[in-house]
């Protein structure tokens, strides 16, 4: 399995992972909020993400491949550059460190439960370390003895972050699948 940054030459693979009805879906804009450029230009979410893929550092996401097939996506942003996340009333901002924040994992049907999310997490951590980020944080759920509903597990499972060396910092007021989301962090 290979994990690569979402770059403009990989845009068709980004569309494969996030696409479908191009006017619906998050397109990894939920935490970012609509920036001033998007508002002024009247961009759609896919147009905004395409611009971010071209311009953003770090890229707004990472893609997982098995052979030539794109099988996963991990949405990434930087705390301090994500207006909706930074101003969230349910997920607190711990400090002013520009840690990389993992917002979501999307794994194609047929590839789930095969280590794709774990590979994406490792790839993002390695990229953050190489870029000199002070840390990586995420907001997963802990289903505690039950299987998480796949529709709500997009935030990741706490056990995966535990295995990757993240520490559980606190339980947030945010929920997914009626479970509280944790704030987990790995200092780099």
Give short role names for the model-derived ranges.
Residues 104-107, 113-130:
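Conserved acetyl-CoA-binding loop-helix of GNAT-fold acetyltransferases
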Residues 121, 128-152:
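Conserved GNAT acetyl-CoA-binding A-motif
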Residues 151-164, 170-188:
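C-terminal "cap" of GNAT-fold acetyltransferases
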Residues 26-61, 171:
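Active-site rim helix/loop that mediates acceptor-substrate recognition in acyltransferases
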Residues 60-62, 98-100, 178-184:
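Short beta-strand micro-motifs in enzyme catalytic cores
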Residues 2-20, 24-25:
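A short beta-loop-alpha structural element at the N-terminal edge
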Residues 1, 12-16, 35-43, 47-49, ...:
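Charge-dense, helix-prone N-terminal extensions
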Residues 56, 65, 69-112, 148-155:
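Conserved acyl-donor/pantetheine-binding loop and adjacent beta-alpha core of acyl/acetyltransferases
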